[in-house]
Regions:
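Generic cytosolic/nucleocytoplasmic N-terminal low-complexity/intrinsically disordered segments
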Residues: 1-2, 146
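Conserved SGNH/GDSL esterase-like catalytic core that processes O-acyl groups on lipids
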Residues: 39, 48-129
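Alpha-helical cap/lid subdomain in secreted, periplasmic
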Residues: 100-193
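Aromatic-enriched hydrophobic runs in primary sequence
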Residues: 5, 11-14, 43, 57, ...
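Alpha-helix boundary/interfacial micro-motifs
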Residues: 19, 61-63, 68, 130, ...
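Residue-identity detector for threonine
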Residues: 4-6, 10, 23, 30, ...
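N-terminal secretory targeting modules
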Residues: 2-67
Length: 193
């Protein structure tokens, strides 16, 4: 799995403009502002956690690039974006090791440089959950930006028995991210390759 995921994440991070050719929707945001983030929060579900967790692979990539990086992962099994309290996650909290302080010792934002948001695998395309997905993606992206961090929305991969959902997921997630001026990490498209 590691041999597949590291190249996929690397390709997704470096070649995000390439996925416009494979979807009906072109991404509005094609680059992150902070090219050297030092802290990250990953908000997701079991897709984010299992197989050593996305945070472990990102840590491996950043170590290979000799880049300082620490990440926190908060996942809920089968969790939709609406299950997460991103406002609370963004702190800062007094005893939190990720909390940043100014020269006087006061807690400051952002606690994280980037926040990676991953919805449940069918959430962006299941008719019943689309409105909630869009509502909470908008709310979470606004919260992340207000706290001084940069949101990154994951284009999740289709379930193994539904490969035809790859394009549907990409189109739905890119559309929702575009509506909120957020970049998409095209992991689902990279896995499909």
């Amino acid at each position: 799995m590691k041999k597949i995921l590291i190249p996929a994440l690397t390709a997704a991070l470096l070649c995000s403009s390439a996925f416009a050719l494979e979807t009906s929707v072109a991404p509005k945001v094609t680059d992150i502002k902070n090219h050297s983030p030092k802290t990250g929060l990953i908000v997701g579900n079991s897709y984010s956690f299992y197989n050593c967790g996305v945070h472990s692979y990102l840590r491996g990539l950043t170590r290979e690039n000799k880049q300082d990086w620490k990440a926190r992962i908060i996942t809920i099994s089968s969790g939709c974006l609406s299950y997460h309290d991103v406002e609370q996650y963004m702190g800062p909290h007094e005893m939190d090791p990720y909390a940043k302080k100014d020269e006087k010792g006061n807690l400051i934002n952002p606690m994280f440089d980037v926040v990676i948001l991953q919805g449940m695998s069918t959430e962006p395309i299941a008719e019943k959950s689309i409105p909630t997905f869009k509502k909470f993606l908008k709310q979470h992206v606004a919260t992340i930006k207000a706290k001084g961090a940069e949101p990154i929305v994951v284009d999740t991969w289709a379930r193994q028995n539904k490969p035809e959902d790859t394009k549907k997921l990409a189109d739905a997630i890119i559309t929702a991210a575009n509506e909120n001026d957020a970049i998409v990490l095209p992991v689902g498209l990279a896995f499909a390759e």
